[in-house]
Structure formats: C-alpha cells, structure tokens
Amino acid sequence: MLSTLMQQIGIHPFWAQLLLLLVIIYFGIRFGGVALGLLGGLGITLLAFLFGVAPGKPPIDVILIIIAVVTTSATLEATGALNLIVRLAEKLLRRHPERVTYLAPICTFSLTMLVGTGHAVYPLLPVIYDVAYSKGIRPERPMAIASVASQMGITASPVSAALATVVAIAATHHVAISVPQVLCVTVPSCIIGMLVAATWSLKRGKDLADDPDFQARMQDPRMREYIEGGSHSVLGEAVSSQARSALTIFLLGIVAIVCLASVAQPLLPLDAKGQPLTMVPVIQFVMLAAGALILFFTGVKPKAISDSKVFNAGMIAVVMIMGIAWMSDTVISGNKGYITDLLKAEVERHPWTFALAIFAFSAFLKSQAATLTVMLPLGFALGLSPATLLGSVPASYAYFFFCFYPSDLATINFDRTGTTHIGKYILNHSFMVPGLIGVGVATVVAMLIAQVVV
C-alpha cells in the first residue's frame, strides 16, 4: 500500500491523498457537468485500493433533500410559474429604470430565495440589460451584481440544497440548528452584503458616452444594430391559471416547512427512538407533497418536469455532490486525527480563518451545497462552535472567482455592449469586485449575527 511506503519515508499519506483530490477536482471542472461526480468515484476507488483507506459516508440526507427540492422546483418551472415571477420582476424594473443597479440584484436575489436555485434567473438577464441600456446606464453595473446576487440568495433560501445541507449535517453531529435560525443569519447578512456591493457598482466603469471601447464598437453599423437590437420583455406573454395555482402551492409548501421548523414542531410524529422528528425528512416529504399537489391541480406533464432546466441542473448537482463529497469525506475521515492536529491550533486562535478555507474550496468546487457538505463536518471535527460554522455559511459562494459558472457566462452573453466581460488576465473580470464585496460583507455580518442567534 502507498500509505505504508509514504510513512516509511517520513511523509504522511494525507498529502498524497489531498493531491489526488485536487487533481480529481481539476479534471472534473475541465470536463464539466456530471464529470466531477464520476471522477469522485474514481478517486474513491484509487483511495481504497492504492492507499487502503476505507470509503467514507456519502451524504445521503443531502442528496435526498436536493432531489426533493429540485423536483418540486422543476414542477413549478414546467407550469410556467417562473415566468410569472419574472413578469413581476420586470414590471418593477421598468417602473423604476433609474434604480436598476439596486433593483436588479434585489430581483435576482429574491427569485433565488423563492425557488432555491440560481438557475431560475436566466429569463431576467436580458430584461436587466434592456432596462439599463435604454436608460443609458452602463449594463455592467446592474448585470454583474445581479448575477452575483442570484447565487448569494441560495443560502438565504428555505428550500435550497445548501440550507438543507447545513441543517442535515448539524443534525448528524447532534447539534440543533433549525431552518429559522439559519435564515435569521443568512437572509439579513446576504442582503446587506448584496446592497453594499450594489452601492459600489453604481459608479463602476465609465459611462457609455465616455467609454472609448464601446464608442468604437458603435462605429460599426452591424455592431450598432446588434447592440441596439429589439428589446426583450415577458410582459406581453399570457399567464395561465395553472401557473398561478402552482406558485400558490409552492409558496404554501415553503411556509409549511418554516412553520414546522418553528412554531408547529409539536405536530410532527416521533421517530423510531421516540425522539422528535428532525427537519431533514420533513423538508423531503413536504416538498415532494407540494410537487404532487402542483401535479394534481395543474395537470402538468411529468415529462415536462424531467425535461426542465431546473431538473437537469439539479440532477447534475446530485451526481457532483455524491462523487466529490464522498471522496472528500473519505480523505477527511481517513486522516481526521492528523488534520485536526494540523489545523486545530490555528483555528482555535483565529476561528474566522475557517471561512477563508470554505471560500477557497468553493472557488474550485462551484457548488455551495457540495462545499458545505465537505467542509462543515471538518469544522465540527475541529471543535468549532456552531455559531462560527453558521457564520461561515455565506463564504460557501466563491465560484465567481474563476468566471466560468453558467450564470456568469450567460450574463456576459446577454450584455450586448460588451461591458460585462472576462478580462485579459482572467481574474480581472466583471464579477470579481462585487463578488468579493458581497460575500465578504455578508460573512462578517453573518459571524456577528450568529453569535446572537445560535
């Protein structure tokens, strides 16, 4: 076994296993999609047969919650209810175009909070561009922060996989962190971070009239026609009664989860051990029940659900999390004592550094749920307080750092002026500063609030 050989030459096997994990993540990102999950399985195989490490535990609770939430959100999308939400957002943006730099991120953040996934915001991006350009506002200003805000809203959503991950992992470690407690920390902190980043965005870049690159593009008649192309709007699209019914049922499902997690807990049955039922299975069956009611009352076709963008993105996330989180748990659980000894002194002196570790891991993993699935158990193993771990949750969004996430790429494509861009040096892109400001401020505020809430 490689572990024995490495110990004989004075190198702890953890470092080789960590290198293998980073290599798996690198190639998983290069291939994209479900590749990260598949390669995670390959990594576990290599750890088992080359290093003699027993496989860790796959995050079954997290995976089941994601499946339940994503399926119900996909059912909502299949009824056209997402277009109803986008329609309401567009009305607000067009009514106050001069405030688009604030209203755009508020709309994308709220949309993500409502449906639990940032992939629901794509129909809103061309609307934001149209409103900004029509008002003479540099589109980069509202569009970049709108994309960032759409992902910041994930940990502030009661039906997101990331929030469910926090509750599930805390329960696994016998720590009672409820859905309302998480929301009390993440909602205000992420909103404050988003608004600070939006304020910075108000004056970013040159006005279009003073931007030489933009003015040069406008000299080309074909480019001018492309930039000033027809406006995009969903206001003229009909809204069906099915969409209204589906949205009502979905919202009632969210309210039910929040109520059962707080004031209505006595209504829940006891488990086989006579203990109060945790919120992990409750989130699963309530969301599936909401999806079933939408199915019955709207008559939406099951095939339309499985063909939806939300379902596709969610199932990719499930495979990613199963493979890479399982491999990460294998590395961590197989070397827990060594890792704890290595990091405990520093983390005890400066607990906030754990948030930096979460941020760094997220930049590569590109999933808040997957990042929290890997890092929170390590935080508990290091003896960090629940308040510190909960305060670190907003730091799980760092995949704006390398600008290759679908929502960021879509934002760049929808900005026909070219002001929202990936820079020459890759890291100097439009999302870097608003992302760092938004996540940084949100994490600091969350750390402060968590000390009171938990």
Protein language model features and the residues they cover:
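Membrane-interfacial helical/loop segments at transmembrane boundaries in membrane proteins
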Residues: M1-L2, V167-T172, L268-Q275, T340-E346
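Hydrophobic transmembrane alpha-helices of multi-pass small-molecule transporters
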Residues: M1-S73, D213-D329, V433-V454
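Membrane-embedded alpha-helical segments and adjacent helix-loop junctions characteristic
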Residues: F27-I29, L38-L42, A48, V53-P142, ...
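Alpha-helical transmembrane segments
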Residues: D61-V70, V182-A197, Q275-M287, T388-F402
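Helix-loop-helix module between adjacent transmembrane segments
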Residues: V70-A74, A104-A120, I145-P158, T186-M194, ...
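Membrane-core helix-loop-helix motifs of multi-pass transport proteins
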Residues: Y129-R224, S233-S245, S385-A395, A410-V454
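Membrane-helix interface motif
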Residues: P158-A171, S262-L270, M327, V331-K336, ...
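Terminal transmembrane helical module of multi-pass membrane proteins
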Residues: Q368-A369, F402-C403, D408-N413
